Amino acid sequence: MLKLFTSSASRVHHLTPVSRVVGSSPVESPLFKALSQITGWNRRSTSLGHRAFFCSEPTNGEAAAEAETKAVESDSEVSDSKSSSAIVPTNPRPEDCLTVLALPVPHRPLFPGFYMPIYVKDPKVLAALQESRRRQAPYAGAFLLKDDPSADSSSSTDAEKNINELKGKELLNRLHEVGTLAQISSIQGDQVILVGHRRLRIKEMVSEEPLTVKVDHLKDNPFDMDDDVVKATSFEVISTLRDVLKTSSLWRDHVQTYTQHIGDFTYPRLADFGAAICGANRHQAQEVLEELDVHKRLRLTLELMKKEMEISKIQETIAKAIEEKISGEQRRYLLNEQLKAIKKELGVETDDKSALSAKFKERIEPNKEKIPAHVLQVIEEELTKLQLLEASSSEFNVTRNYLDWLTILPWGNYSNENFDVARAQTILDEDHYGLSDVKERILEFIAVGRLRGTSQGKIICLSGPPGVGKTSIGRSIARALNRKFFRFSVGGLADVAEIKGHRRTYVGAMPGKMVQCLKSVGTANPLVLIDEIDKLGRGHAGDPASALLELLDPEQNANFLDHYLDVTIDLSKVLFVCTANVIDMIPNPLLDRMEVISIAGYITDEKVHIARDYLEKTARGDCGVKPEQVEVSDAALLSLIENYCREAGVRNLQKQIEKIYRKIALKLVREGAVPEEPAVASDPEEAEIVADVGESIENHTVEENTVSSAEEPKEEAQTEKIAIETVMIDESNLADYVGKPVFHAEKLYEQTPVGVVMGLAWTSMGGSTLYIETTVVEEGEGKGGLNITGQLGDVMKESAQIAHTVARKIMLEKEPENQFFANSKLHLHVPAGATPKDGPSAGCTMITSLLSLATKKPVRKDLAMTGEVTLTGRILPIGGVKEKTIAARRSQIKTIIFPEANRRDFDELAENVKEGLNVHFVDDYGKIFELAFGYDKQED
């Protein structure tokens, strides 16, 4: 229904004093000048100044009303629709208004002597106000709204909406009882200007729509004008007003007007004036309005003015601080400009453009002969362009950044490579155990470089499961070759601009990763490790895999073009090393340009060596444990590897070893194994404090033990520290440090039952064993069939169907009278059921499982097999020979069956991997049948 008038000018606009000053015209009054500046009133509209008065006494209202009525009687008919400051007759007298419209004021109460613009949204209320003016009774009651306990105070929009919905008794209950009789100064549209006259108190409701109430006119309690306390309080209010005048210019005109003419108003008016112009909240202002005791009202106003004074001081402090900061910066800027001008006149310093040009020329001068001609030409052109541009233009910054990149690249600057094969071998062996094929390839690269006298860039892809050392071996290769190392990961990369750079036309454009690499390392022949190349993304910004073709192709990277530089760069000397977990995810055109080296993972023996020679030393040093303080047995390491860390790599093994040494460190500290020397302090004072504390502790120990000599307790303390027992970690107490075993034996059966055969599988995490289980569901004539479970993929399901067919064929050949497959419904399962599985290499294992069930004969002990089978019984080659061999060794399998076509792959394995294994290579399933079920004949 009502909305408080708001303005960005100041809070004075909400409540503005309208007092007349005796002896001065309204136009010349300083207060009226302030009002005209704030509200926009001018000399042509001075009628409001004539009728804007304090009306706490009845005679004031009568005299002013009669004078104004006579002055503007001829213009009264059109005043409503024109100026908001039109003269309005004020008959009857204010004290005669005992029944008034109740207007809610939402934000601050209206004080006598002040005006307040409000917006009336209710048509009925607006019509009633206009009717009151026409009946020459332009008065209404302005009452502050109480807080709505059910509304969110932080939402002003919701609060105004709730006000508009209030009607009748509901609105009456939300109004404060004490308000102000307000004269309706003007109505223009839905804007109403109210001028406060005197205090009112609501007696009862007369009508609901619009809300009309009976009121009592309130008068101030009698008081002694000569009371010293009242005088002192009033003068303190005036003094505070003067202080506010010094700190805040917002109220300067108002305070000056009222303090200069102190005799023109009374103490009650002074209290109202101070409370009205303060920034007090609505409840504090309402408390002043309701107070009829003049002395108490002055005290309340004084408290509010003191708070206002404190706020003004804080504002002044903040303003001064900001002004000083800005002034200091401006002064510094002017002095710098003057200094530049003086240096330029003396020839000591050139301008910014000349300095930039000199800096860029100085950069390229040492390698000017090595810079390609086309690049040098572009640099010269851009330097000339830079001199013609204004320093404040955006093109100047673009050109400056472009020249900065062009001149900082290492054109023709190559690091001295190491062609010493023996030294390279030593470095590679220091950092990594095993990985002989990778080391051999790097040594071949060095040998070729030594024979040619120079080296060429190559693209090597290290493929293997996580944690086998693909990334770390790239760093070791760089150290062995004496090349700079740079790594960037392309996992999830979906923007071509990350590789090829952005065009310079874009805001914030930057070169690609390769150019950033050259700037970072400072040489043109670094070793660049492109990590996770099998996890490239593809999005709306292009295909990064296609962008890498130009980067990695030896035929193209000699003229690699970055979009930002727009000049070709020679990357033919760069050695690229890529890493991937699965090469199947790498696009074929990209894979074709790489030399793939597979890192299958580590066998148990290799993991033990790595843990003992590398991981344990690093963890011990990181935890501050001395070698003589702990001993980890080989059995503990073996148990840790087999029961906690079965993955192909050693990353998890490193975490577990670090966990063990952290617990050992905690145990040593609790048992008192502290270092002999004091802890290193961050500053000398702290070091002295530590020394004093240590000395006091030693002295305290001497007193307790009643030792006469000062040297004996120190020796005893040292003896106690050294005498702590060495922590022993073995298989029996390993669980106390790393918890319960995570893995259990993959070999589930000592003697595999009928229908169960162990196969070998390969995953991105390495090799593993895989059981194939088959059982009879139902028997009966003509009920033959096969159910398959185990979350198998399409390829593996087809392998099961092929295995069922081949098994029936073999059974028909060997035992024609056996009708097992024709009359038995079978169920083939591959545990574990929660693990997805796919691939053709389990074909021979499935056939063996079916035949074991048909012949009711288990396969031989310690046998595992792998191989794809055709319908004719031929065994096709498989992948992951090393991983599967490692998995078989881990499960203590001694006999393995591989396809004949994989014999060469097995022969290439290291001797420690092949040691102790009885491997059979077959090309037809008939041989597998003899190996699996003919063990009785072999034993005979």
Swiss-Prot record:
Residues 1-61 form a transit peptide. One of its GO terms (biological process) is protein quality control for misfolded or incompletely synthesized proteins. CDD domains: RecA-like_Lon. GO terms for cellular component: mitochondrial matrix; mitochondrion. It comes from the Eukaryota. Residues 100-309 form the Lon N-terminal domain. ATP binds at residues 464-471. Its main location: mitochondrion. It catalyses: Hydrolysis of proteins in presence of ATP. Its EC number is 3.4.21.53. Keywords: ATP-binding, DNA-binding, Hydrolase, Mitochondrion, Nucleotide-binding, Phosphoprotein, Protease, Serine protease, Transit peptide. Residues 70-90 are annotated as: Disordered. The active site is at residues 841, 884. It holds the Pfam family Lon_C. Residues 751-935 form the Lon proteolytic domain. It is an enzyme of class 3 (hydrolase). The modification Phosphoserine is found at residue 74. It is found in: Mitochondrion matrix. GO terms for molecular function: ATP binding; ATP hydrolysis activity; ATP-dependent peptidase activity; sequence-specific DNA binding; serine-type endopeptidase activity; single-stranded DNA binding. ATP-dependent serine protease that mediates the selective degradation of misfolded, unassembled or oxidatively damaged polypeptides as well as certain short-lived regulatory proteins in the mitochondrial matrix. May also have a chaperone function in the assembly of inner membrane protein complexes. Participates in the regulation of mitochondrial gene expression and in the maintenance of the integrity of the mitochondrial genome. Binds to mitochondrial DNA in a site-specific manner. Homohexamer or homoheptamer. Organized in a ring with a central cavity. Belongs to the peptidase S16 family. This is Lon protease homolog 1, mitochondrial.
